Amino acid sequence: MLAAVEVFAGNGGSGYSRYGIGDISYFVSNRAIGMGGAGLSVLSNNSIARINPAGLSQINRTSYSISALYEGISTKDGIKSGYFGETFFDGFMIAIPISPKNGIVLSAGITPYSRINYNVITPDSFDNINYNTHFQGDGGLTQGNLAISALPINDIHVGAKFNYYMGTLNHTTQQSFGSSSEFSGVKRSLELRGVGFTIGSVYSGLKNALHLSDANSLNIGIVFSTTSYLTAIEEKFYTYKTATLTTRDTAASNNFKMRIPYSLGFGTSYLSERFLLATDIYYQNWKRYTFNGVSASELRDSYCFSIGGELLPKRDQSAPYLQRMPYRLGFFYNSSYYRINDKPINEFGITGGFGIPIFGDVRIDLGIEYSFRGTTDLQMQKDNIFRLSFSLSGSELWFVRPEQE
């Protein structure tokens, strides 16, 4: 549980990332960041879909993207407060069209799946002895992926993705006593490896049923990721220090299994010449999470609802620069997987962003997000979170034969 009184120490993020596997990263695409995260049903020829592999099927040039994320958290527990900011690598993706006519596109990448980042001190006493307990954690899970999409029949886009999970979760607990130099501590390190699979589909034929013009489209999408079983190698490092002696010990490694539950998402989107509107719902069955066969009472099923839009004033490359920039706005509500002290931890946020053309097909996508999470009830933490996403992407033709003279 989150302690009654916490002092926020040094670098670190929210204490909520102490639970489960940390804060879950949800990144649909560079474009979706400014749209509340909505985009599971969006088909694009210049934005690489990370979650729904069916969204790759319209890419017709070799495309790449690399992303970074700044996250600043202002957190308080009703007594103490603090602000922490840090910049993270947020993934690299590449997509290569094999047969654009048939929607066959291969993609590969490495992206964050979860992140642990906290550093708090809790003062306490026992039998008239004052002491501080220092909780610190870092690490997280990374996902390497290999995906393929196809267009087997008109308007039905399908995709499949192989996911390889890897990472290390570190949690350290240290107790120090009064003004003395004595302390004892234990560091628990989990090294995780495992695989999973994702399948998805987008249906783009609704415009025909509704007799929309060729310039418009109305899509629905679905994506499903399987339950994954990760092998966990656990090590514990013990430290005890007095004024005259420092003792360190390492416990033998143990092999366990961690169960990452399945997820299911649905989305709809409408695209016209100038506007894109999208809405999604994404669910993950975290009640089924287990470590070494034991479930976590601090976790619950999660739901994320997102809605957003994009305005592109002009598609003509000869139009004024500011009219060739897409402008984005969105909202999301994340009923997160945290349930601390029997209190659900929910997050509500507003997002915005825009794309900056650089030259050719190279562009920068900026996404800005401000959200609120948690509560100070029961002296838990309330977080105000600012996130700034930066993505550099582009495309070019590969494997094209020159025309014969």
Language-model regions, residue ranges each:
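Subset of outer-membrane beta-barrel
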Residues: 10-405
